[in-house]
Swiss-Prot record:
Domain topic, free-text comment: Class I metallothioneins contain 2 metal-binding domains: four divalent ions are chelated within cluster A of the alpha domain and are coordinated via cysteinyl thiolate bridges to 11 cysteine ligands. Cluster B, the corresponding region within the beta domain, can ligate three divalent ions to 9 cysteines.
Amino-acid positions noted as binding a divalent metal cation 7 in the UniProt annotation, renumbered to this chain: C49, C54, C58, C59
Record: residues binding a divalent metal cation 3: C14, C18, C23, C28
Residues that, per the record, bind a divalent metal cation 6: C36, C40, C43, C59
Name the UniProt record assigns to this protein: Metallothionein B
Entry binding sites for a divalent metal cation 4: C32, C33, C43, C47
Species this protein is from: Notothenia neglecta (Yellowbelly rockcod)
Length: 60
């Protein structure tokens, strides 16, 4: 699992709207921000986004 620490790979802005910039990981744990492609619905807190697409298989 790629922890995708945005502080190392890009910039992470947390708040009402979470955004990751320059994040190139392919699978991300949602600790602060998800790194799924733009347009993806954010997973509930604690969920893990896998791969490059978000759908029903994204959250577990």
């Amino acid at each position: 699992m790629d922890p995708c620490e945005c502080s190392k790979s890009g910039t992470c802005n947390c708040g009402g709207s979470c955004t990751c910039t320059n994040c190139s990981c392919t699978s991300c744990k949602k600790s602060c921000c998800p790194c799924c492609p733009s347009g993806c619905t954010k997973c509930a807190s604690g969920c893990v986004c896998k791969g490059k697409t978000c759908d029903t298989s994204c959250c577990q």
